[in-house]
Amino acid sequence: MRPGPLTSSLLLSLTATACSHKAPLSVSPSEPRPASVRLDFQPPVDRVLTETQRSVRSVERRGDTLREEVELTTQTRFTPSEGGWLLAQAVPRSRLTRNGQEVPTGVADVLARFTLQAWLAADGTFVKLVAPEAAQEALRQVAPAGTEAGVLERFFEPEALETRARREWEVKFAGLFQRNLVEGQQSWVVDLVPVGDSQVAYVLERTVQGTRDTPLGDAVVLGLRCLDAVPEDAPDALSEAWVMAGRPELTPGVSCEGEQLVGQGRFMPVSRQLTVRATVAGEAWTVTTESRAEGLQEEAR
């Protein structure tokens, strides 16, 4: 059982800094301001949001290529709670393949046995996980004691689980809600992608590119790219995002491209695709993550 390939699947379908500040925004004051689009955080109530997620990691080392792919289905519910929202997410199905061959993993059993719960503020800010120890309890039901169980226990440790959940939520949604967004407007967050025994760090730049009609309604379109350094003449908002994240060392030469669609009106993570490429310790890594909302279903009573 290896936790690594499933890192991005745990969290909140909904994957950035480990702090709770909103991501800074920037738009040139000298440019004419186009019509704005407002995103309010209005989750669907009494509905189950089903998403499919896919993460593909490939690494070239010593002339060989290893490819791992994770596919999973998440089901998410939102309930009003204490002036905010309780998010509850289950992972009823997950699948890992390595070089095209399915690999049995006890991690899938753990994910299927507990529901991840997070408390969000009224404006969509991530506050904390609720009862994160449920993950380790599920692990004890699945994994026998031993060295590998110890690795998984650390992976599902409440503090580590909350850090990953917070980062994944914020890298996708921090700074987008309760604000008027205009085309060309940019925001920045620091993201980390685990690769082997190391990680890739970069500043993710999100640029508002307008709106698009989708089967799930109108959505705001965000173009995604990453920066491997903070330029000397960087906007204050970009520098602030890096400082807020603790001034991490960014991975030289990292590149990425992608797109994210967030529904207008009620909260709907329509889709997201991001491909990250980096060379770490002489190994060439490519990590692609994709998520797509399949729709809402009325919750059974």
Where would I find each of the regions flagged by the language model?
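Bacterial N-terminal signal peptides that target proteins for export
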Residues: 1-9
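C-terminal motif of bacterial Sec signal peptides marking the signal peptidase cleavage site
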Residues: 17-18
